[in-house]
């Protein structure tokens, strides 16, 4: 980005030095490590919960670059997230938290590919199985190990460009008084 967009970022008055310090590899910490960071910062956090915006800011401030949080408690992730074969209480999921308080920009993980396990998980989550027929049909006759992720484009653009609010990166943002363009 800096090779191709330095002028644009300077026009936006982005502090380029903060982006120049972003180097690979990104730190990888477990969910438990992240909870420990919160506790060390006197945050009253309920284990098994997802992180809020303030929590993500505290975690990211420890690193000043994107940080990968993995090995989440399984109950905090979606039914389709595969469990860790070494510890079934953990999900094979990951979130990438951007620095400077921009929050989670990527969420992903390995997907459950076993049809029977998926049916049980849907039931465990008290979800109506008929709503997931199409999803189950994709795995009914066999599947392969696979993963997926979601990237928050607007939040990523907000972080890279240094904008104050995510709505500045959305062409037609929804607000309390405007729900359509």
Outline where the language-model segments fall:
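Metal-assisted phosphate- and nucleotidyl-transfer catalytic regions
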Residues: 1-101, 124-144
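Acidic-residue sensor for enzyme active/binding pockets
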Residues: 56, 95, 104, 154, ...
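Short, glycine-/Ser/Thr-/acidic-enriched flexible segments
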Residues: 72-77, 84-86, 101-104, 110-112, ...
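Active-site pocket scaffolds in enzymes
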Residues: 109, 114-181
């Amino acid at each position: 980005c800096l090779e191709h967009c330095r002028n644009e970022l300077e026009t936006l008055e982005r502090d380029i030095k903060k982006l120049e310090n972003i180097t690979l590899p990104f730190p990888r910490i477990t969910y438990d490590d992240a909870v420990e960071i919160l506790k060390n910062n006197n945050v009253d956090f309920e284990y098994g919960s997802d992180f809020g915006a303030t929590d993500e800011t505290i975690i990211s401030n420890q690193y000043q670059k994107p940080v990968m949080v993995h090995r989440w408690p399984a109950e905090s992730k979606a039914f389709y997230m595969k469990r860790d074969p070494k510890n079934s209480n953990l999900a094979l999921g990951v979130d990438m938290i951007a620095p400077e308080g921009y929050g989670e920009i990527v969420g992903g993980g390995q997907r459950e590919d076993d049809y029977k396990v998926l049916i049980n998980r849907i039931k465990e989550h008290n979800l109506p199985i008929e709503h997931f027929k199409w999803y189950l049909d994709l795995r009914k006759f066999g599947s392969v190990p696979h993963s997926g992720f979601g990237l928050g484009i607007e939040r990523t653009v907000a972080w890279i460009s240094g904008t104050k609010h995510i709505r500045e990166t959305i062409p037609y943002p929804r607000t309390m008084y405007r729900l359509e363009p």
